[in-house]
Structures are given as structure tokens and as C-alpha cells.
Amino acid sequence: MRLPLPVRVADHEPLLDCSYFDAGLCRSCTLLKTPQDTQLAGKQALAESLLAPFAGRADVWEAPWASSREAFRNKVKLVVTGTATKPNLGIIGPGGRGQDLRDCPLPTPGIQLATPALAQFIAECGFRPYDHTNDRGVLKFVIVTESPTGELMIRFVARRRGVRGMLFKMLGRLRELVPAARVVSLNVQPERKAVLEGSEEILISAQSTLPMTLDVSGQPVTLNLRPQSFFQTNTDAAQVLYSRAVEWVHDVVGSSSRRSGSLRGAAKPVTAWDLYCGVGGFGLALAGAGMRVIGVEAQEQAVGAARESVEEMRAAGLDVEADFVAADATEWARAESSRQGAGPGVMRAGGLGAGPDVVVVNPPRRGIGRDLAEWIAGSGVDTVLYSSCNVRSMAADLAAMRDFEVVKAQVVDMFAHTEHFETVALLKRARG
């Protein structure tokens, strides 16, 4: 089922100009020739149709959030092709040829500025681009992330760790070419297959984290990204998602205790479990608003970054109650509810170590899966905040959750000019 989008261009509406698309050299932005309001209308129509069976009321949908047309993508994964003296940074284009995309209009300004300098740096280091057709060469990708303050994380993905010596030697030169470089690392991916990165990460810089300070409902929340951590690729969209979580959860759980945007002061502290928490975006936003939070994430590096953010919040004088655990979300939720002596389903609500008032899930594209959906359905939780980059898997999960209905929802255009988008929904257990 594809988006119901016409490809006709409206004469009155300006479109994003891209020479790569016009020349047929890159078609990653499949909807580039569709007006952005038409793109968004199609995404809204698809989300409404798929979630209609679970909507508790006709007016659950807020107006969709529209992304900037350009310069919104805070992370790029650039394939390194060409030669050691003249590298290209971009994609594998038509016919399997490397296509340089240093003038792509989608990345944030700092990434656009850094890309030509990174190509020069690679040439000065003499790194031979990896050729997947003959398994020769060394440098596979360069992954660049920009923070809201303009600092960069630069990751070089190579087939062997031997290039680290040159990276250490040339770090000063890299910072001359790219002054915004804060975190620099080498990822080792030795295998000859379509895998972006490997498990081994070698820090080249002294700094190990990229601070991402966001505006969440008017309050600053700083997340710390480590090289292998996940973060949404559109910073403005991430701020919208976290703000909706704080606002919507307050509306249904903490309306009697809010003080200046806070959930503090409730007779019974409001507790949330943030499953698939990543570096803690949703959980830290809720903790900053006064909730007690436990975040669960399989990737230990992300959990370490989330804990670092908690310590920084406390050092800044914020009274936050949050903990983050490295574990599989489904296994942890089942084990925790059993540990409390409430069996696999109903749990006690209350303190930081007790069952939650709210469950937050922000899973990968495949969704939370039947096991976790059925656990939520059988638990005593009444409120779920579900954020999804795949509304189809979200609908399948809601079907497995049975008694929950959508009471608030919004389409967030995280990935402009493509068929992909984020959907955030507040779910309540239906009564009667």
C-alpha cells in the first residue's frame, strides 16, 4: 500500500531545486516533484486510514507538522567512491557508479559546509575508497551528524583498523579543515556485504559525545550522542515528538499537578517506562517535566549516554528521577512485572521501581511486535505514548493491543520528499 500521492506539479507552488534529481543521478527523494503540501496530505490520509479502526473519537488528529523543505537533515551517511586523490562522497548511483552529492540541499548547513572539506581530508590522508565489486580499497563511508549548536560528529567507516594511525596523526589537520568537528571516530567494518557499520568503534578525538540541546515545550533538554547512538535525523521533528509526549501525557495523567509546565507535585508521582529509549529522548523529556522514568534500550552505548544526560541535569540543579537499563525491552518488561509479584500482566503503579502509569514506545520500523503488544494489553497500564516511523507496523501492533484506542495523534513529516513519516499517538485503555 503506497501513499495516495499525485505526481502532477502544481504551477503555483515552488518545488525544491535539485540538480542531481533533475539529471537522474539521485532519486532518493522519490516525492521531490510533488508539492510539499500534497506530500503531507497524502501522508495524513494514509495514517488516518490505517489508524481509523483504533480511533476513539473523530477529532483525535492534530494538524500535521510540516518540515522545512531543505537543510533539515542532521545526519548523512556518505558512500566513499572515486579515487584516493579525488574521492566522491555520496551514494552508489545508477549503474553501480559512485555519485558525489556534496551539493545536496537536504543536510543542515554545517554538514553542507563540511562535506567538500572532508573529501579534501580523505585525499590528503591517501585513503583509497573501498570498491565492493572487487573487495579492494579501505574507506567505505563517512557518517556526519550536526548538533543544534553546529558541532559535528564525524565517523569514518573502514574495512580495517590500521587506518587509525593516520587518523590520529591527521586529527589536527581535520580540525583545520572542519573546525566544527567535535567527535571523531573510526568504525571498523571488515565484511564484504551490505552492512553500514561494524561493532568496533575507535575514538580518535578526546570528546566522546555530541550534545544535542533541544527545546521541549519551552524547556531545554540535552541529549548526549555517542558514535553508534540513534537519534532522529530531523532535529526540529524530534523536538515536536518530545514536546507532544510531555504535553499529551500531562493532559491525561498529570493535569492536577502541573506547575509551570511541570508534572511535579502530584500526590502520587507519575511513573513512565520508556521502552526502546535510545539515548533517552522521550524519557529525559518526561523526567525534565517531573515524571519518574525508567528507560530500557538494548544498546549499551546509548544507555551510557542517557545516564550521562541524567547526571548533567542533576549537576545543573534539576531534581530528576530517572534510570536507564541495558536490556531487551520485551524481556525486561516481563521480568520486571514478574519480579514485582504481579504475574505477567497487572502491575503495581507507584515508585521508581514499580509499575508505570505510562509506557512510551519508539520502536524501529518493524514495530514493537506481538509479544510486547500482548504484554501491554495484559498489563495494568492505561496510557501508552507510541511514536512510529512506520504507521503500518504501528497499526498491526495496535490490533494486538486490543483494548487501547487512539485519543490523540499527529503526523510529523520527519522525512520530507519521501513516502516515509513519523506518527505519534497517545493511547488510552478503553473502558466498557
Regions found by a protein language model. Give the residues of each.
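Rossmann-like S-adenosyl-L-methionine
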Residues: M1-R8, V163-F168, G172-G432
